[in-house]
Amino acid sequence: MAFWLRSLGLHFRPHLGRRMESFLGGVLLILWLQVDWVKSQKIEQNSEALNIQEGKTATLTCNYTNYSPAYLQWYRQDPGRGPVFLLLIRENEKEKRKERLKVTFDTTLKQSLFHITASQPADSATYLCALD
């Protein structure tokens, strides 16, 4: 059985219909733009959709430029829901694991890899990386 994972830098769902979510989405967009402008930071994640065979390892890539972050975080976002924190890795750590998840952080390559081993259809979601 094959399924897909999405990896995006920023994902908004304006059709949710709740005023509070629209308001918060606008505030988050403004804050994100301010942080991006101040740090002149560019984050790139690999392909928008990734098709994975069940049981195989899924690997998502997050590349960044211009500065060295103190840490990098990965989040999972299911449709119609907010992002959920998964893992945080610090600049002095090369690798971090949690159950079937593994994150590597290479400050020389300015890259983080996010691996999901023994992939399952329930892993289908949007995955996001964030720097600080």
Curated annotation (Swiss-Prot):
Keywords: Adaptive immunity, Cell membrane, Disulfide bond, Glycoprotein, Immunity, Immunoglobulin domain, Membrane, Receptor, Signal, T cell receptor. Gene3D superfamilies: Immunoglobulins. Glycans are attached at residue 63. Residues 41-132 form the Ig-like domain. It comes from the Eukaryota. Disulfide bonds join 62-129. One of its GO terms (biological process) is adaptive immune response. The keyword Cell membrane applies. GO terms for cellular component: T cell receptor complex. Residues 1-40 form the signal peptide. It is found in: Cell membrane. Its main location: membrane. Alpha-beta TR is a heterodimer composed of an alpha and beta chain; disulfide-linked. The alpha-beta TR is associated with the transmembrane signaling CD3 coreceptor proteins to form the TR-CD3 (TcR or TCR). The assembly of alpha-beta TR heterodimers with CD3 occurs in the endoplasmic reticulum where a single alpha-beta TR heterodimer associates with one CD3D-CD3E heterodimer, one CD3G-CD3E heterodimer and one CD247 homodimer forming a stable octameric structure. CD3D-CD3E and CD3G-CD3E heterodimers preferentially associate with TR alpha and TR beta chains, respectively. V region of the variable domain of T cell receptor (TR) alpha chain that participates in the antigen recognition. Alpha-beta T cell receptors are antigen specific receptors which are essential to the immune response and are present on the cell surface of T lymphocytes. Recognize peptide-major histocompatibility (MH) (pMH) complexes that are displayed by antigen presenting cells (APC), a prerequisite for efficient T cell adaptive immunity against pathogens. PANTHER family: T CELL RECEPTOR ALPHA VARIABLE 1-2, T CELL RECEPTOR ALPHA VARIABLE 21. This is T cell receptor alpha variable 6.
